[in-house]
């Protein structure tokens, strides 16, 4: 895959010279993705046909949100994946007197130049450097080696110059850390490329006068399904009726012949837009979907925006980051869905009343209604022969039957993917998947809790409360008076068991459609 476009050559040269003048080091180009595509796919008579696409969508030439600042502990490194790249995020602010300075969020390749140990297992030191836990080498925010303790003093400076980390441009916008996954250009040049931000927050539609209340992503979640099936899911409002029965729809009364029409045609950089009976849909490349629901089963009819970044992390994995916008003037709590969303949005709309960790846990009720469906759907598509980045793949229309208007968003997205984007992400890693059924699709600990500062703190506090309650059982057994011993002991035991059961929601939450009456 090429990372340079001829028309940008002069601009990039100017930016590189400017970067050098400011003492910045241009980023090195990453290794070529193992599955890089140089063709796009179009559908002709139901068959996949490869055609030359010299200006196909460049997946590595765009900004992606990868984490939520509010849930990140700046005193430790955070492992993330993007397009098959293994990265580590960390904050280079110094700590003085126990107070961490604001600093900047940095993104390095999660691999120490010394012996390729994972930097995500390292430490952020008080001086704002990242220390590799394997041998103690340190790196500053630019990626330069700031300390190489094993080198003789006479050679240390020369050794350090040859030991820089591979770094990627970053920025913070709309409460999220964004990464530009192309080391071939400088950070300054990357910032010249606009990030696909939610336009309602920065450039409202003409004539629209909305006072948006905003909930930045409720929490980071990783799902073991294809990122493209997650995009497809967010472009499919009809699934709310059945898949989210009891929360966002009714499988028996809501399905009907909903109509949709295209309001903005599919294009490489512009994506597409649709409008219909269930609201409006917009796809913004590379991975943003915006849905404005406008039918009775969904909350805040016509006054809500669900903006979801379906971040492609690795083959068979996706990190959805959803920003929710609600018009402040919209009435509150008239339907079950609105009351449920009030809990989800509580830390923003009712500050101080609902802790942030509760919104994270509560959101799994809706998210896990999709989990098994998307995991199995992604594997079924592969089993049916749909692998659009590989030669000989069937077309989407060959493996799926979509005769109705309500699937128009999915059809438009698959057309964009095939015609303009080489069929999908050219992963920077091997695209082999783990055996089917080997992943825990209802996991909460590794998918969220372990790297969310709010939920991790809450889990630890609940653990302390549980242990105190368990200790009270022992104390009750030692009471000299037998009369209060039994009720006190039983109450303490019930409390300890109840807390432990609730803590299970931080570890795993399983959902069954069979049992969802």
Where are these regions (language model features)?
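Intrinsically disordered, low-complexity polyampholyte segments enriched for Lys and acidic residues
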Residues: 7-10, 22, 34, 38, ...
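C-terminal catalytic domain of Rieske-type non-heme iron oxygenases
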Residues: 96, 185-517
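Rieske [2Fe-2S] iron-sulfur-binding domain
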Residues: 37-47, 51, 57, 67-206, ...
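Glycine-rich, flexible loop segments associated with nucleotide phosphate handling
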Residues: 7, 101-104, 161-164, 348-358
């Amino acid at each position: 895959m090429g990372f340079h476009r001829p028309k940008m050559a002069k601009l990039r040269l100017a930016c590189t010279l400017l970067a050098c003048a400011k003492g910045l080091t241009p980023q090195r180009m990453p290794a070529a993705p193992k599955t890089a595509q140089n063709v796009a796919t179009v559908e002709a008579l139901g068959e996949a046909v490869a055609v030359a696409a010299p200006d196909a969508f460049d997946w590595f030439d765009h900004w992606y949100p990868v984490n939520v600042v509010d849930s990140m502990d700046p005193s430790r490194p955070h492992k993330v994946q993007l397009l098959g790249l293994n990265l580590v995020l960390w904050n280079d602010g110094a700590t003085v007197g126990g107070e961490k300075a604001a600093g900047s969020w940095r993104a390095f390749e999660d691999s120490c130049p010394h012996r390729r140990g994972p930097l995500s297992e390292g430490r952020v030191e008080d001086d704002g450097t990242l220390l590799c836990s394997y041998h103690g080498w340190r790196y500053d925010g630019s990626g330069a080696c700031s300390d190489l303790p094993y080198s003789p003093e006479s050679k240390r400076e020369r050794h350090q110059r040859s030991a820089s980390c591979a770094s990627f441009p970053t920025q913070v916008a709309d409460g999220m850390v964004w990464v530009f996954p192309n080391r071939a250009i400088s950070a300054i040049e990357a910032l010249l490329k606009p990030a696909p931000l939610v336009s309602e927050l920065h450039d409202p539609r003409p004539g629209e006068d909305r006072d948006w209340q905003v909930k930045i992503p409720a929490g980071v979640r990783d799902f073991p399904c294809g990122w493209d099936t997650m995009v497809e899911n967010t472009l499919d409002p009809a699934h709310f009726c059945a898949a989210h029965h009891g929360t966002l729809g009714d499988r028996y009364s809501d399905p009907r012949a909903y109509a949709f029409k295209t309001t903005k045609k599919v294009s490489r950089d512009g994506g597409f837009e649709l409008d219909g009976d269930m609201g409006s849909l917009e796809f913004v490349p590379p991975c943003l979907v915006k849905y404005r629901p406008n039918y009775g089963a969904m909350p805040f009819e016509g006054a809500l925006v669900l903006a979801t970044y379906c971040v492609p992390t690795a083959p068979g994995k996706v990190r959805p980051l959803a920003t929710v916008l609600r018009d402040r003037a919209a009435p509150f709590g008239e339907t079950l869905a609105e009351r449920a969303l009030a809990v989800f949005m509580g830390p923003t709309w009712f500050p101080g009343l609902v802790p942030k960790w509760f919104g994270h846990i509560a959101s799994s009720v809706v998210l896990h209604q999709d989990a098994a469906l998307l995991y199995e759907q992604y594997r079924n598509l592969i089993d049916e022969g749909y692998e659009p980045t590989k030669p000989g793949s069937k077309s989407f229309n060959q493996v799926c039957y979509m005769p109705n208007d309500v699937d128009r968003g999915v059809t438009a997205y698959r057309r964009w993917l095939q015609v303009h984007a080489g069929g999908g992400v050219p992963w920077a890693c091997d695209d082999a998947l783990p055996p089917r059924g080997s992943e825990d699709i209802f996991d909460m600990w590794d998918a969220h809790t372990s790297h969310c500062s709010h939920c991790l703190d809450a889990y630890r506090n609940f653990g302390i409360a549980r242990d105190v309650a368990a200790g009270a059982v022992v104390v009750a057994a030692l009471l000299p008076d037998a009369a209060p011993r039994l009720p006190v002991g039983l109450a303490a035991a019930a409390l300890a068991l109840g807390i432990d059961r609730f803590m299970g929601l931080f570890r795993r939450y399983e959902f069954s459609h069979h049992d969802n009456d």
